[in-house]
Amino acid sequence: IDLPRKDRKHFIKQALGEGFGVLAEIGKKDTSIKIEPARAVEQVFEGLENGAEKVIIEGRDSGKGVGIYNDQGTVNDQLLQDLVQGVQDHSRIIIEAPQTSQHNYLLIHLGPNVNLGNVQPHDVLTLESTRVGLRGDTLKQCLINAPRSFELFAMSRNNDG
């Protein structure tokens, strides 16, 4: 759905006024429409400024060809870096990640507290085991990348106030 900015703002404010919690979403399910980093960061800030608790980064059910993913489902690292650096506090975004390889990549690069959406029910236990370091396939990488994760976490904590 293409909603003009003023309509998105109106609907968020209306839902908040009715006592609902609000999540906004950016990105399109259409694989021909790619996310532009600067515009995506702008949309995240707009959603948060309008009162959304978090902003979801579209990833579809397939995790292929939309959002931060290429047609094979691999994370576009530069786009992810641009988003995280632009938003600064990645605790305010939820990244749709339906594939296990995407969970692992995001946990390794953004740390165990990254917010993931569109996780398949049969993947939840594996994902949570990975988050707490109980899976051998990502534990070593998490330890290697821990300084980067802590740096990103510290950046997000500094922006809390």
Segments from the language model and where they lie:
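C-terminal helical cap(s) of enzyme catalytic domains, especially alpha/beta-barrels
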Residues: G67-D82, H109-N113, V124-G161
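Hydrophobic faces of well-ordered beta-strands that scaffold small-molecule active sites
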Residues: V22-I26, V55-I57, I93-A97, V114-N118
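Active-site mouth loops of central-metabolism enzymes
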Residues: E25-R39
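Short, ordered loop/turn segments at secondary-structure junctions
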Residues: I1-D2, I26-K29, G59-S62, P98-Q99
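Catalytic cores of alpha/beta
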Residues: I35-L48, P98-P112
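Active-site-adjacent beta->alpha loops and helix N-cap segments on the catalytic face
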Residues: I1-F20, K34, G63-L80, Q102-N104, ...
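Glycine-enriched alpha-helix->loop->beta-strand junction motifs that scaffold or abut catalytic
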Residues: L16-G21, N50-E53, Q88, I108-N115
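Glycine-rich phosphate-binding active-site loops on the catalytic face of alpha/beta enzymes
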Residues: I1, V44, N50-K64, N113-S129, ...
